[in-house]
Amino acid sequence: MTLEQKLDRIVLRAEELRAMLAAGVDGERFVAASRELAEIEPVEQQILLLRAAERARDEAEAARADPELRELADAELDSLRETLPRLEHEIRLALLPRDAADERPAILEIRPAAGGDEAALFAAELFAAYRRYADLRGWRFEILDYTETELGGLREGIAEITGRAVFARLKFESGVHRVQRVPATETQGRIHTSTVTVAVLPEAEDVDVEVNEADLRIDVFRASGAGGQHVNKTESAVRITHLPTGIVVAMQEERSQHKNRAKAMKILRARLYEQTRAAAAAGRAADRKSQVGTGDRSERIRTYNFPQGRVTDHRINLTLHKIDRVMLGEFDEIIDALTEEDQAARLAAAGA
């Protein structure tokens, strides 16, 4: 099927759906038709704009035959030579298969990897940077778990981020983030290299993952603070083990055992859902060869070099000399570049 035929079908389908809704249909069919129309109507509008621009181009080319109209027609054609490719590119992007999770909230997990105390300190800074990014985007950032080290570093930080297109924006952040700098405890001025792992998981809905209570082992214990001191005399902390997969989630952020269990289940569902998504993605060779990487947590994706003031994303060879701005939450320039690279790779794979 040619692109033109695909566009014709979309316009025709939108017209059919509008007629169906106007005629009146029963509840379930009405909901399904409304949802489908909402999905394709923005593409239909782009198609109509493209066709209007194509008609304007044809009219301008015909007008060039008139010497009195040639200058005006040439100006119109110059404008349309920019407009037409842009509209066609936007339509091709809109026709790419969508990740069903893109519009979902996300679970952000950050942990220190190699580098001891320095890795934990950078993990805390990176967690704070993503929190500021959420603020800049107008998202809600709720801490589900935040465990500090004695020096104020981060042993484990988990947050739920809700808002528009959260997972779509953050999904390329999963992987190993490397930091190069002179630690505050370094007396010789030597640069140390440490690493932090970031995982971004789409939040799972009940229909995505079925969790059987019989598959869970739930332990309760007393919450502890940094250094292991007890901060709660009641057994409010919860550890849930999913026996079939061995996934373990511990939660002690809340004073209520019930709230800790609810948060732990939310994280467990997200991890199980991501496991399912990863297995499906492994079978899609084109996706796994995407230039922006696989989203694997073991993949080194970015380096933050403080002495040089630079941030380098290794997947797309992008270097920004504005590390201070990035650590203040200004990730958009990096994320935009990653998104464009991913779109280009998917367009190439689709032969578009």
UniProtKB/Swiss-Prot annotation:
GO molecular function list: translation release factor activity, codon specific
A GO CC annotation given for this chain: cytoplasm
Keyword Transferase tagged: no
Post-translational modification: Methylated by PrmC. Methylation increases the termination efficiency of RF1.
The keyword Cytoplasm is annotated on this UniProt entry: yes
Domain of life: Bacteria
Primary location recorded for the protein, binned into one broad class: cytoplasm
Xref: Pfam families: PCRF (PF03462), RF-1 (PF00472)
Keywords linked to the UniProt accession: Cytoplasm, Methylation, Protein biosynthesis
Annotated localization: Cytoplasm
PANTHER family noted in UniProt: LD18447P
HAMAP family: Rel_fac_1
Family: Belongs to the prokaryotic/mitochondrial release factor family.
Described purpose of this protein according to its UniProt entry: Peptide chain release factor 1 directs the termination of translation in response to the peptide chain termination codons UAG and UAA.
Protein name per UniProt: Peptide chain release factor 1
